[in-house]
Amino acid sequence: SQVGPLGTPVRLGVIAATDEDPGALRGLGTYGFIKGATGYIAGAVVHGKHNLEDFGYLMERAILFATDLDLGTCWLGGTFTKSRFASRFGVHDGEEMPAVTSIGYDAEQPHLQDSTSRRVANSSHRLPWERLFFEGRFGTPLPPEAVGDYATALLMVRLGPSASNKQPWRIVREDERWHFLIERSFLNVPRT
């Protein structure tokens, strides 16, 4: 168990096929989005005020580690059968499993389904800078030339993946403070 930067305990682990049990991943349910994965990074987080932020932070750290090992990854938030993964991972009462990440070696040639999914999600297009980053308040775009040493970090935020390529994040710089916000759409409503 690890604790996220906002104080929520998070458990992460790997569910993997082995030479002794090559069928270990069968039946987990990814709705056909993942083929040939050798494993999944799964996790559980206790319910709480900042649980999703802490889960996301620690999951992304695990993904960066896997990427450093030359493994391909793919976040799965709405395209996996949570009950099957939760059962396999051992999610306890009072915990939830917001997402899993497939891990494995990237396919040499992308499949038709991959390119179709990317096209439907509009994955090759990103919102323009002025729709993501603001100076002082919404409606006042933050000029790229005004961010100095933060230019690369903000560019990476702009290029980063998001569910269905919605890019829901917005950043408002107010003097020396940076406010990170989520723009919710009718498809991305707050949890109750």
Each model region followed by its residue ranges:
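Acidic, surface-exposed loops and disordered segments
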Residues: 1-192
